[in-house]
Amino acid sequence: MVKLSGIILLSLVWLKLNNSYEIRERISNKNNPDDDILKINVEEDKKKICNNILIFLNADDILTENNKYSFMGKCEKLIDDIKNENNSPDITNEFALSLMHMRSKHTITSSINNNKALKNIIISLDKSMSEPEVINRVKHIIRFNKYLAGKLSYKNIGESLVLRVSSHERMRRSKRELVRNILKDFHIYGLYFDLKSENSTLLKNQESESLINIKNEKLCQTYIHLCQKFYEQTSVYYKIKTILNEVIKHTKDNYALEGEYDISKLFSLENSISQVSQHSDHMLTNESLIYDMNKSNYIKYNQLIHEVIPEDGNIEEQVKKGNGRYIVVVKNLKKAIGNSENYDNIMNIIKKYLINVTKNNKEILDMVMELGNEDIEQFMTQLVFFIHYGFLLITEDKHMIYLSDMIPTYTNLYRANEVLLLHIMDIKFESDDFNKYEKYKFETSDNDKETYSLLNEIDSITQLPKLSENVANDYFSKIMDKDAYTMLTLDKGINKYQFYFTMAFKDCNINQNYTPLAKDLWTELIYTFDNFGWFYFNPNKIMSSISKSNFIRHVLVSRNFILKNMESLIYLDTQISRLMDMIGLSFLADKSEYILDLSLSNYLFLYVNEYHIFKKDENVKLIHTYDYIDSIANNYYYFSEKKYPVFKTDYSSKLYTNFPNVYSLAYQLFNELAINMNISNTPLKKKLKNKSNYAYFTILNLIGPNHDIYSRGPRLIFAAYMLTLVFFIESQIDISRYRPNDMYFMKKAMPLLAPINRDDFNILKKRCSLLTDFIKINRNKAKNEHSRVEEYIKILNLVTILLWGKESNKSLYYDNDVSLYKKLLIACVFNGGITVQEKVIKSIKRSCNMEQYGLNKSNIEDFVNVNLSVYQWNPDILEKIATAFTLTCKVHNMIYEPFDVHKVDAKDYYKLAVAPDMVKTYHCFLLGRQAERLLESLILKKNFVKFKVEDAIDVYEFFYVTRILSKNPREDFELFLKNKKEYQKKQKDEIIKNSKLDENVTDILFQNYECYWFKSYENFKSLWMHAASNLGPGAYLRNFFSEIWNNMGTLFKKQSKVRDVEYFNINLIGGTLIDYYSPLLKSEEHCRNVTQKLFISMKDSGTKSRIEIPDEIKSKYFQCKLDYYKNNHSDPVHKIYSRDFLENKVYVFKQPYYLLSNIDDKNKKQLLRLFITETTLQYLLLDDIQIPECLGRCTIEHFNKVLLTTANAKPHETIIYNGLIPENCKSKIRKEMKIFIHSSFVHNLTRDYLTGELIRTQDIQNGDVHVCMGSDTYYTENILTDQHFDLTHKPQFNFPENNNYRVFLKKNINKIAKNPESQCYVHYELSVLDTDIPDPYREIGKDLITNIELLESK
């Protein structure tokens, strides 16, 4: 027999990875475990090494001689294998971690002694490592084990990148520097514009010559999108000016009546913009007058528009109608020429010029041939007007036209219907090749080595090659505009460039800048696209998928989308530039706290998608790359309650530290693109996939060069990357718009009962491979070559994919609102295209002898999927429990005999009870499948309607007491019904009789066993619904369930028992404890009585019609609830009385009051322990409500049963370890408990209460700080005020001086007074948490107020 001791508790412990508390179980020993492990030294003899291992596991005096003999044989063989293997370090590391993991689960000892003993065991196994190497290895083994146990605060990785967090000095400096530089760069704007004026006014010292070269200045490189707008306007002006000069020259050269007209003056209004109109005398006759033009105030009218000198009242009246003295006029060419014959000649000469220019393009030539004299005149009038004023002539819908619609851009020309002018510009300045289809094809470098040789400068942060600074700057200038110097020589000194500069930069917004990093990446991405074709897809491949006959349709789709959404696209581009800055900050983050220098097979994320900096040594791994990406993503999603003004693109000097969700911005554009492609919504995704070349062609035009002159605008490489990935995800990866029946399983996150359909996971695997392959931007990568821009795009891709999946600011894996499809697909992408199940299975096969538990190739997938499903399909938890499983499996192989989990009987039950949690969970689900089949057979046997709630209770109770799989469940069920107590006693006696463990230990194992399906109302309901769904739909099911659901609460209330016990001092009875959550329950009963009486009164009185009564009752009910919370939450009925203690009906939350922001900052009591009665406990367990102290929905694991020091616990009860446990306590099982504080309040905890020493946040994160939990922490006075219920309370985050949140360093425990009355006599470990849970009182209050307002409005 194995004696009662710690070795049994090696496997008794459930490492509660789905819980917020890290709790370990142990048996108390007479001898201090530290005394034994101090004997462990470096040994050569393998027998002595194995003895040391037994001592380290605290099992040396536990095993029988037979057990010990078997263990020693297996242990010595393993040591031989380790010493003879070539990859000894890998095996040694994993075995050492297995030992550390098993020891930490049941023994509480000094970390210093653990380190020394483990170091000596490792040296005994592998002497090739030096002393410093072994010490470092031990440190990382212990860190990894802490992570598995939930003690490592790795979530701080997520905080290190968020601008509001003050941790990590280096990151704080980097963030400050980023913000400081953004502000500094915005000040450059003040060098060009008068910031004090009401509107953006260009300073007088800015000459046109200097503005033309702005591309070389900081302003242009900081606001790339605005700079491109400026150069686009100047380029268009230059081209139109050139065309007009050619027309004038051609007319002069071909007009016979030379000297009759000054052709130059004929095609001109004035030589200067700012002067008195010479046409005022014609205003009311034949001269065209445009006065009703709605123009922006960003420019001064007298610098652009003619000033009219009125000559009589009529003109003055006309000016008054024009809303001012400044108007614009249009040249009347026909009147200016005078002679109709001369007019015809001049128009014909101009037409011949147009014919000559367009002769190689048949379509345009045909259009020119059809032009009459009036059409030619209108064309020339518009040219003359534009060259004179600098903006376009628009004569229609003048009330809706703003100056920004009249500036010379390609899209404005198209909107103004200047089609002929655009064609001429295209022909003269683009290319002689009129085949647009061919122009989209371009050559790229196919020589990988040559490609990387051009990226020849090493980036100081990532240590990856990037484009050299000179090449990048030259290419940036080229992108801006190639005609800049030509324009300067052509129009030297003209002030229209000042106007264009003003119009481009008037909307300068500090939140839409490009930092030097973003600018370099922006240039580098365009450079690699133009020269190498680096993108998600090959541009030439897209063009080859478009037929020439269909090409025009693609151009039109692209044109319509860009014309409609250009400003939104520019905005998206600027916001992604800030995202690139956040990625840059992530590279700067100090990752030393989050790496493991190990060669284990159980990494949390695979090498392929790791930060490149860790690729230099594949043994160095970041604990959680996912957290780094998630922290960046959270800067764009629900970062704070304050909403960012999305699409606010006008001038702003206010800097926001939170940003819009870039995925949402891109998704809106995706919808616009899908609609533009004229795709119906049924089923949308499939058609999107089939027509994707429309979208990709459009995106190619965004990157540029856009050969469609009608929609040409700024090059937007960042927006193109984001929109392309979003389009691919939404069209080929996302399943949300599929019909429910198509992917029903994947959209839910229910635990598995029946084995899964492999087709569902094959779809997931296929789409994961598609997405993983798609996000590679360089398909012909040379071996071992990697560039900076590839690394940034990789991280951008991962952030984008995370934003697609996120439903809140919670970690996506821990958010129950996220479907299993998204969780598993995102995990698969982070693993480089390997599903989390595949990775776990590979790890198990490599590290564990599966036959130990009856697992094999045929059932390992089901085994893993079941365990994954019970944890809400959380890949993070699966990898943790799988790692714990393989570590436990190694030791179990040496200690216990094998068994088959599919055939557990009374003889093997004790093996199941000490097996890893994954095995127990799988066995539970095998029981659940038997329960499902039994339910189906009983429902069918009783013809549905005869199946009553009593039958349901019988089925539940049968499986609640059953511990083993039955060969014939129906037969055993019938035996159970004959005598339930006798059946349970017989099964228990048989299990104890066959167990090779101590009888008391076996009894504890029997009592503590629980199965997922039978431990809560919700879980059993899921099983039941699954069984019923197998029988088909119908009214009988509705009738059947109506009775079941009405009685389920009674059924499960008596089954929910809190198993953990915490001792308190006897003086607890004398206090006036308040049940904080009692009003949630009592208000319901109170208000139902009130409204019932009101209903009877209203019905009898007849004062209200039958139609009015329901709304009146609802309104009174909601008002009653709200009033109760406000006025009655401190009533005596909510207090806890001495009789509740005497009847053992008092419970306490493990976690103290969590929402400390609700407590007034003058209140000395900032640490509050919440006690509740049994009635409130049952309500919280049954109701679907988010309780902060439970960090979500409550389970029995979140509570301790209160026991006074005068009472005695039962032998099988688990005791929370503290100094109040009586010496004569019958139970020997202990648990350690951890207390959490939200990270927002950690800054208040800076001093050791006992010694005054400085306490750092890092000390808390390392588990080196304890918190005092004395009697002054008990909740005895209400903290909620009226402000909490009318939603006006302002959260506080600072504690007053001398508050009761007392903390001390663990090393100072011996300084605590040996007095049970001391406030620190009871203390627990403190840790930091980032989880945000809504206040239930606030949420309910908000809902009640909303409902009352809605009803009153009716």
Curated annotation (Swiss-Prot):
Signal peptide feature range: 1-20
Record localization: Host cell membrane; Parasitophorous vacuole membrane; Host cytoplasm; Cytoplasm
Gene disruption phenotype: Conditional knockdown reduces parasite growth in mice and in culture. Delayed progression to trophozoite stage. Aberrant morphology at schizont stages. Fewer merozoites.
The keyword Transmembrane helix appears for this protein: yes
Membrane topology, from the record: Single-pass membrane protein; Peripheral membrane protein
Transmembrane segments: 716-736
Paired cysteines (S-S): C50-C75, C220-C227, C768-C828, C848-C889, C924-C1011
Keyword Transferase in annotation: no
Assigned keywords, A-Z: Cytoplasm, Cytoplasmic vesicle, Disulfide bond, Host cell membrane, Host cytoplasm, Host membrane, Membrane, Signal, Transmembrane, Transmembrane helix, Transport
Functional note: Participates in the formation of new permeability pathways in Plasmodium-infected erythrocytes enabling the uptake of nutrients from the blood plasma. Required for maintaining invasion capacity of merozoites. Required for parasite growth and proliferation.
Binding partners and assembly: Component of the RhopH complex. RhopH complex is composed of CLAG3.1/CLAG3.2, RhopH2 and RhopH3 with a 1:1:1 subunit stoichiometry. Interacts with CLAG3.1/CLAG3.2.
Record protein name field: High molecular weight rhoptry protein 2
Source organism of this protein record: Plasmodium berghei (strain Anka)
